[in-house]
Amino acid sequence: MRTCRAATAGKLTAVLATLVLALAACGGGLSPRAWAASVCEALTPWRAEINKLTSSTQQQMTAQTTPAQAKENLVRLFAGAEDASETARRKIDQAGVPETEHGEEISARFQASLGKVRDAYGRARDTIDGLGTGEATAFYDGVRTAVETLNKEYDASALDTSRLDSEELRQAFDEVPECR
């Protein structure tokens, strides 16, 4: 009787160990298609918000407002872009890790890219917030410089999805409806 129970317990332990190892190998991540869809669902509203804020910023640069009004509006706009970028970064973090080779690294690169964008908007906001408004020409020159710096930092932070280390993810980004 003891031998039978010991043999059954040994088999059960072996089955459970195999199951645990199999589940651990999966990593609990999302399929490449599901992860790509989650990423695009996070980035679509972010892009729309950034486009809206960019358009508003361009209008602000050409509008007939006082430097103090422009400063207030631009600080608010860049704070909005900073917040939108952090929201998108958080959503990608919440999407988890794609079940693909280098999945953790790929997820981290997406998050790092959005973190850099967020920080660039924050620096632009802080720079403009620090500008004096007594002399209009000096103020708008400072704004122009801040926006040029923002554009450079923004471009430098871009993540090229065509250079993903995973063919599965490249294909998923090309195919899922959320990314079109």
What are these regions (language model features)?
Residues 2-16:
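Bacterial N-terminal signal peptides that target proteins for export
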Residues 33, 37, 68-79, 104-111, ...:
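Short, charged, amphipathic alpha-helical segments
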Residues 121-180:
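A charged, solvent-exposed segment within the mature domains of Sec-exported extracytoplasmic proteins
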Residues 86-111, 123-135, 160:
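Short, solvent-exposed, charged loop/turn and helix-capping segments
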Residues 46, 53, 57, 81-84, ...:
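Amphipathic alpha-helical coiled-coil/heptad-repeat segments
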Residues 28-79, 175-179:
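Immediate post-signal-peptide N-terminus of mature secreted/exported proteins
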Residues 22-25:
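C-terminal motif of bacterial Sec signal peptides marking the signal peptidase cleavage site
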